[in-house]
């Protein structure tokens, strides 16, 4: 039986500071919102909140990977069942859409190309740009929606009439790093109901209203890999090229199965041990020599070779869709959940940018994204080409 709403109470935490950028989102019974229903607790509660706010709410489950390929990497069938159960509980219609073709063309092929080139990409960022905030948005607009909504822990703001992407108020769950490539026009058409909440509050609301997803484990990793070993998945698409593992001094100490299976700062899975010449301290990846197909390692997670003061990045996406004025002093993240790092951005003659950090950064990884902030505002970001010291 669909829920009958009385009053939805959301506890405001002391840590949830107010922002002068925030846009008010009054209830509007004439506005139709389609929520991206993933089968998780965040999108479930997003739909719940929007219904309480008076919107006309419908859901959409996106199939972005063909789980019928015989590998069963995805949990799409279970997720769809959960999304349907929540939709039934809320009394809303659930649409389904197959974006597997768009995902393959615009996300997965790029993912493979980056790994083949020896870099470590983040497909979730491209998925947000090309699928969740493009294909999904276009699909929803064709259904005469006024907005889409997602369960991302970010907020929508405004300054001088321009949409802004803000960090989520729960610092431990903020997902703005993954949404930096989404433009202002898409942000203006999107609602982020759980961006104002802490994760514990989201789960409390889901349990209070009897949603099946209230204790569902958060999804981790890449959808199309799921619980399988990354190496097992990748070798189905890219041929492995084994090579030597060397120390910084050039000693050959082991063999690797392929550079694409390793990333800067990696400790696990190197297969190095029992070397009489060296201590038992763990080994870490410090560099991938693509020309020689050699993995370079060192002992000690705080070794100076793991730290860089500068990086060069390209392929930028600015939320405002206009690049800022350089030089720009701001803060940056080189990986998800990293604390904001003070830096200065300078534009190079070839259009790339050089980022100079106040403090050396550990394990800066080519192929990953560097994302820039001023206070809570996400400016945008780009793809790391190379990291170095001056």
Swiss-Prot record:
Annotated localization: Cytoplasm
Q: Where does ATP bind?
A: 36-43, 62, 151
Give the enzyme's EC designation.
2.8.1.13
Q: Where is this site: Interaction with tRNA?
A: 152, 368
Chief location category: cytoplasm
Of the GO CC terms on this record, one is: cytoplasm
Instruction: Give UniProt keywords alphabetically.
Output: ATP-binding, Cytoplasm, Disulfide bond, Nucleotide-binding, RNA-binding, Transferase, tRNA processing, tRNA-binding
Taken from the UniProt record, the cysteine pairs bridged by disulfide bonds within this chain are 127-223
The ranges of region (Interaction with target base in tRNA) come to: 122-124
Q: Where is this region: Interaction with tRNA?
A: 173-175, 335-336
InterPro entries, sorted: MnmA-like, MnmA-like_C, MnmA-like_central, MnmA-like_central_sf, Rossmann-like_a/b/a_fold
Q: Which reaction does it catalyse?
A: S-sulfanyl-L-cysteinyl-[protein] + uridine(34) in tRNA + AH2 + ATP = 2-thiouridine(34) in tRNA + L-cysteinyl-[protein] + A + AMP + diphosphate + H(+)
One GO molecular-function annotation for this sequence? Answer: tRNA-uridine 2-sulfurtransferase activity
Q: Name one GO biological process term.
A: tRNA wobble position uridine thiolation
Q: What is this protein called?
A: tRNA-specific 2-thiouridylase MnmA
Q: What organism does this protein naturally occur in?
A: Marinomonas sp. (strain MWYL1)
What's the name of its gene?
mnmA
